[in-house]
Structure formats: structure tokens, C-alpha cells
Amino acid sequence: MTMATPFSGAANSIVAARTVLITGVSKGLGRALALELAKRGHTVIGCARSQEKLTALQSELSSSTNHLLLTADVKSNSSVEEMAHTIVEKKGVPDIIVNNAGTINKNSKIWEVSAEDFDNVMDTNVKGVANVLRHFIPLMLPRKQGIIVNMSSGWGRSGAALVAPYCASKWAIEGLSRAVAKEVVEGMAVVALNPGVINTELLTSCFGNSASLYQAPDAWAVKAATMILNLTAGDNGGSLTV
């Protein structure tokens, strides 16, 4: 198992065309990754809650008719189940799944975070990932192949004031990923991936204007896409960093 291993692969690595499912695809890292993968000739399957944002993304994807974007809420088990059926029917079983959908609490001490806000972070960041695993891993098992990337965070390996719910959710992702890695068949891989510090809406909610000092999602996506596309069964159980 690799702990917090940085990836330094070449951006021009040539890999076979893949079908990649990305949750939370309509903005931030998910959107940037989708655009980069499509540009490289891979098929993107994506989900998000906003149909308006999905429509906008569809028009920007290279070879836009090859991709499938669906409205779904990962917090809802039934929504993910329905999405899985639709994806298998229209595109088959994804080669790679990137569990990217996530949210963060407004900067607050834990005793100032409402129960509703705490639940929303956990339901999205932890239960949302579990829902995807529940419905897609059984589809991958018979093929004895498939890569699952669960987006973690530096705050899933450390702690920070004012974002305790988010930290807890990402620590959960680290543990969930390591445990599930021991449950899948040989040939598959489940990893936790710390994307690094990127200038997204989520970061802005924590850092304010200082978020603009960090790299943009599209620059990050070039490195992240190469890393994700080159993951193998040998990476199973890894705790990785872009």
C-alpha cells in the first residue's frame, strides 16, 4: 500500500480509450477532469444535480455526442440505483469511476454547525460514495477489472479548525477506500486520491479570495487525468496524491 504518494507521470502517456464515470461533474474538479478526458478521446459519463450546468458542459465536451450526462443526486440511494441501470443500458460498465461529488460546511466551530449542515456533508461525501460503490462494484466484479477513485483531501489525512465535518468525511473516505480495497477481486483497484489544493468554489468557501493563489482546475486536470488513466490493479488500497 502506498501512503500519500505523489504522481509524476508524463502528461502525454498514451492509453487505450476508457469509459469514465465522474460524479459531481458539473463544476470544479469534476468538470475540469471531464473536459480533459474528452479532449483525449475518452468517453465521459457524468452526473450532477443541475440539468442546466450539465447542458452547458455537454456543449463543451469534445465529440459531445459520445458522452452521457445524467441528473442524479448521489445522496439518494434510489437515484444512484436508477443511474446505474441507465448507464449500463446506454454505455455499459464504466472502466473507471471517480467519486468526486462533494461539499463542505461553512467555516464554523463544530458546536456552531447545525445538525442539518453536518448531515449534508456526511450524506454527500460519505454516503454518496457508498451509494455509488453499492451499485457499481457488483457490475465490475464479474469482469475482474475496474478502477475506483474516491476523492479525498489533505484534510482527510490531517485536521483543520472550522471544517471538522469535512475533515471527518474525508477521513472516512480514506478508511472506506482501504477497507473496500480488501473486498474487491484481484484485477480491480480502489484508491483514495488527494487532489491537492485547487482554486474551486469549495476552496473559496474556506479561504476566501486567497483561493485564487492556487492552481486552476484545468491545469490540475492535465496531471490528474494522466494519473487516473494510468492506475492499475497494483495501486489497489493506495492513498495517493496528485
Swiss-Prot record:
Pfam families found in the cross-reference section: adh_short
Keywords (A to Z) from UniProt: Acetylation, Cytoplasm, NADP, Oxidoreductase
Protein name per the record: NADPH-dependent pterin aldehyde reductase
Primary subcellular site in the record, as a coarse category: cytoplasm
UniProt cross-references to PANTHER family, sorted A to Z: NADPH-DEPENDENT PTERIN ALDEHYDE REDUCTASE, PTHR45267
Organism: Arabidopsis thaliana (Mouse-ear cress)
Gene3D superfamilies in UniProt: NAD(P)-binding Rossmann-like Domain
Consequence of gene loss (knockout): Slight reduction in seed pterin aldehyde reductase activity, especially at low temperature.
Tissues where this protein is expressed: Mostly expressed in seeds, and, to a lower extent, in roots, leaves, flowers and siliques.
